[in-house]
C-alpha cells in the first residue's frame, strides 16, 4: 500500500492567532478615527449579520470595500508585508507550536483563511507555511475594486480552494486540520482528522 503524504491545515483568525486580522489590519491602515467612522456607519448591517439576516460574506465584502476600495494595490501589498510584523503578538502559542512541529517533520503546512491573502501570506512565508485565502480584486489601473476574486474563503469554499491547490488527488493525502469556528466545519469534516480548537 502506498504511503499517504501528510499535510496539515490551519485556520488563521481564532486558531493560529487570537485576533481578527481583518479588523486589526483595517484599524492600522485607516487609523482609529476613520476605522470607527466606517464601523459606526455599518453598525446596522453588522447587527443584521449577527442576527443572521445579512450573510456574513456580504457584510465582509461591504466592509472591505468601505475601507480599501480605490487603494493602489502595491501600497496595499506593502501594508500587508508591514502588518506581518504585528502578527507575532497575537499568536496562539499551543496551536502555533503544532504548526511548527509539523513543518519541522517535513509536512506541508497550509494556512486556509477567510482573511485576505495580501496581509496573511507575508507572515506565512516567514514561517514556511503556504497560504490559501480570500483574494482582493484589482482593476486594470492597479487599484482595489472593493470586491473579491471569487468567493470569500470560508466554509465549503475552503475545501474547494485547498482541493484545487493540491497537486495530487485527495486520496493521496492524510489531512489533519485545525479550526475554531462555524466557517471551518466543512474543512474539519473533509480532513481525516479535524480538531476544533477550544482552549488550546
Predicted regions and their residues:
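C-terminal cap/substrate-recognition subdomain and adjoining C-terminal extension
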Residues: 1-5, 78, 85-200
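Active-site neighborhood of HAD-like aspartate-dependent phosphohydrolases
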Residues: 1-52
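A general boundary/transition motif marking the beginning of the first structured unit of a protein
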Residues: 13, 51-52, 64-68, 87, ...
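Short hydrophobic/aromatic-rich motifs at helix boundaries and adjacent loops
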Residues: 16, 32-36, 67-72, 89-93, ...
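A broad detector of the eukaryotic-type serine/threonine protein kinase catalytic domain
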Residues: 27-30, 81, 149
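Conserved alpha/beta cores of soluble small-molecule-handling proteins
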Residues: 32-35, 51-55, 73-75, 93-96, ...
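Cysteine/selenocysteine-centered motifs that mediate thiol-based redox chemistry or coordinate metal-sulfur cofactors
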Residues: 47-59, 63
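Metal-dependent phosphoesterase signature
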Residues: 59-94
